[in-house]
């Protein structure tokens, strides 16, 4: 059991859309990811996702609305709900989701699909 310094961990990588695992609890992974640009539309059949903004601003877009998130705010996206994430400038985001959740969910494999299990 070791404490995690989020600023140090976010400083350890530069790529966007590539979640890094920094902790696990009760079948869930705590991941750090940097967003910039727009991610593809997708959904997760079996997993809810929690997006918590550490630094910057991001939005979660749904078919019928857009939710803007700023530092210290989070949103839980229920399983099965079509969505995409976006950030005009770089945002640092914590994700809480079940182990082995594919970041692109139902979307076809693409350059956005991150390798699973990458830890920092």
PLM regions and their residue ranges:
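Ligand-binding loop in jelly-roll beta-barrel domains
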Residues: 79-109
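Conserved short histidine dyad/triad with adjacent acidic residue
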Residues: 15, 29-45
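A cytosolic small-molecule/anion-sensing beta-strand core signal
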Residues: 26, 54-55, 70-71, 89
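A short, N-terminal "cap"/entry segment at the start of jelly-roll beta-barrel domains
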Residues: 1-31, 108-120
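Short, conserved beta-strand element in jelly-roll/cupin
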Residues: 34-35, 44-62
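Structural motif
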Residues: 29, 38, 57-59, 66, ...
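Short acidic-glycine-tyrosine-enriched beta hairpin
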Residues: 63-80
């Amino acid at each position: 059991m070791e404490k995690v310094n989020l600023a140090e961990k976010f400083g350890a990588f530069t790529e966007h859309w590539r979640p890094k695992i920094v902790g696990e609890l009760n079948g869930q992974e705590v991941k750090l990811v940097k967003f910039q640009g727009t991610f593809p539309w997708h959904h997760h059949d079996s997993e809810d996702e929690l997006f918590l903004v550490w630094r910057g601003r991001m939005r979660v877009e749904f078919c019928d609305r857009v939710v803007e998130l700023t530092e210290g705010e989070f949103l839980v996206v229920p399983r099965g709900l079509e969505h995409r994430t976006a950030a005009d400038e770089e945002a640092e985001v914590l994700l809480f989701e079940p182990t082995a959740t594919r970041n692109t969910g139902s979307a076809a494999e693409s350059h956005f699909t991150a390798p699973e299990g990458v830890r920092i």
